[in-house]
């Protein structure tokens, strides 16, 4: 289960739900619109639209 996508070395993945990076990669979650940040940043299980923007692993609200 993808949590905050942080590897032991502090790497964090830009696409959390998909494990978008591997440990040792330099990558980080960016604040962006909800639908662009993986399953963890979607509205329910469909994620068609959200209020505002959120980071990877954040929950967002349905419009």
Curated annotation (Swiss-Prot):
The metallothioneins are involved in the cellular sequestration of toxic metal ions. Disulfide bonds: none annotated. MT-I might bind approximately 11-12 mol eq of Cu(+). GO terms for molecular function: copper ion binding. The keyword Manganese does not apply. Induction: Both MT-I and MT-II genes are regulated by copper ion in a concentration-dependent fashion, and both are inducible by silver but not by cadmium salts. This is Metallothionein-1. It comes from Candida glabrata (strain ATCC 2001 / BCRC 20586 / JCM 3761 / NBRC 0622 / NRRL Y-65 / CBS 138) (Yeast). The keyword Protease does not apply. The gene is MT-I. Keywords: Copper, Metal-binding, Metal-thiolate cluster, Repeat. GO terms for biological process: cellular response to copper ion; cellular response to silver ion. Belongs to the metallothionein superfamily. Type 9 family. Sequence repeats lie at residues 23-30, 56-63.
């Amino acid at each position: 289960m993808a949590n905050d996508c942080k590897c032991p070395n502090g790497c964090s993945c830009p696409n959390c739900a998909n494990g978008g990076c591997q440990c040792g990669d330099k990558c980080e979650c960016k604040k962006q619109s909800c639908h662009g940040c993986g399953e963890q940043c979607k509205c329910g299980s469909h994620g068609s639209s959200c209020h505002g923007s959120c980071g990877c692993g954040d929950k967002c609200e349905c419009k």
